[in-house]
Amino acid sequence: MPELLLLNGPNLNLLGTREPGIYGSDTLADIERRLGEQCAGAGVRFSAFQTNAEHALIDRIHQAGRAGVDFILINPGAWTHTSIALRDALLGVGIPFIEIHISNVHAREPFRRQSYLADVAVGVISGLGVHGYELALQAALKRLDGSPRGQH
């Protein structure tokens, strides 16, 4: 059975209360529940992890590599624009991933327009609100389509 991991970076635990005009009113728990249900229906194992500590996210990526996780969906939050270490961790484990952003980072401050992950991601979804998570999941499920890791 394929396995998918959802990763969320700093401040995403505040979804539902943090700047709802930008990020909406859905909580991270709402998003995780919906994605988990969709994965169950598709016969895919699902797990989720959120942290405000960069080293913890990197450790979780390393663990995913050892565990044979097949695909990662990641909203790296502000680490998108700052973390070469996160990029190196994702490259190091070789798990395909899709980068997700709730807001349109290209319509915001100039410093948010640089991603250290986009060029090594399978794809990037930005600016479609929390619906972007479900779109990323649909793409990941289609890409997995029961194929073993390394054949994506």
Swiss-Prot record:
Q: Where is the active site?
A: 23, 101
* Site label Transition state stabilizer, positions: 18
What the protein does comes down to:
Catalyzes a trans-dehydration via an enolate intermediate.
Any single biological process term in GO: chorismate biosynthetic process
- Keyword Amino-acid biosynthesis set for record: yes
Which positions in this protein are listed as binding substrate?
A: 75, 81, 88, 102-103, 112
The UniProt family comment states: Belongs to the type-II 3-dehydroquinase family.
Alphabetically ordered keywords of this record: Amino-acid biosynthesis, Aromatic amino acid biosynthesis, Lyase
InterPro entries with a match to the protein in the record: DHquinase_II, DHquinase_II_CS, DHquinase_II_sf
Enumerate the CDD domains for this protein. DHQase_II
How is this protein named in the record?
A: 3-dehydroquinate dehydratase
